[in-house]
Amino acid sequence: MDVTNMPKISVVIVTFNSGNVLEGAIKSFINQDYLNKELVIIDGASKDNTLSIIRKYENNIGYWCSEPDHGIYDAMNKGWARSSGDYILYLGSDDRLLEGGLSALGKNSSGADLVFGDVKCLHENGVVKERITTSNFEVLRIHSIFSHQSLIMKKSLFEKYNGFDCRYKLLADYDLVLRTYLGGAKLQYVHHFISLFNMGGVSAFTYKSDFEKLKIHKSTKSISHPYILFMENLIVKSLLIVKNRWLKI
């Protein structure tokens, strides 16, 4: 692989007291066959063995810090600001890059502003399910079509749009990608499984995320009637909750 012709990808891991899983994420980065890469770790002043693991792999890390932050998206903003890559990918400390993931994104970037692929989801019961991303980008106006573990975005876009809006606690990544899309960013979809996403973290199946999505739709004006979509989502989720309780699922 000719490194000089491949864009540099910075993989940012944001972590806090995740020493029990961080090493696996680091190893999944090291094992990638894509050569023009950089690992950045932003730690929120962990008190467990996180720092000892970071120091163990320090020769494989381009930059790392351990300091207090104001939440996950504040830490993620530090990540892109302190990266040197052409593209940025965010990986959770309990997520894993899959074989050939970075190569699939880097080789198929073709100068696109955002490149994303598919993801495998690890559920709490140990079941792994495949999630195929749609290539119908217009769906972004309504909801997210990607997992940030399978997405690279140009650093220049983070700079142009001032990164993640920390007013959002759950969907700031969706907000940022939506703003770039509405601003004319070029998107590229790659049919390849990029990462294993651990679903044990923040759940998208919450009412809080619906309220955040409503705010995002109103702010970006991505759809004509955001309140109608908001109410439809609430009704569907409420019916599912009633059904699950009735069936004792």
Give the positions of each predicted feature:
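A conserved acidic beta->alpha catalytic loop
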Residues: 28, 35, 43-52, 92-95
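Conserved nucleotide-sugar donor-binding catalytic segment
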Residues: 134-212, 216
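N-proximal low-complexity "stem/linker" segments adjacent to membrane-targeting elements
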Residues: 1-30
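Conserved donor NDP-sugar-binding/catalytic core segment of glycosyltransferases
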Residues: 96, 100-129
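Short aromatic/hydrophobic "clamp" motif used to bind/position activated sugar donors
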Residues: 88
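Glycine-rich, basic loop-to-helix element that forms the pyrophosphate-binding segment
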Residues: 66-83
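Acidic helix N-cap motif at the loop->helix transition within catalytic regions
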Residues: 20-23, 48-56, 100
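Cell-envelope/extracellular polymer assembly enzymes that use nucleotide-activated donors
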Residues: 7-10, 38, 175
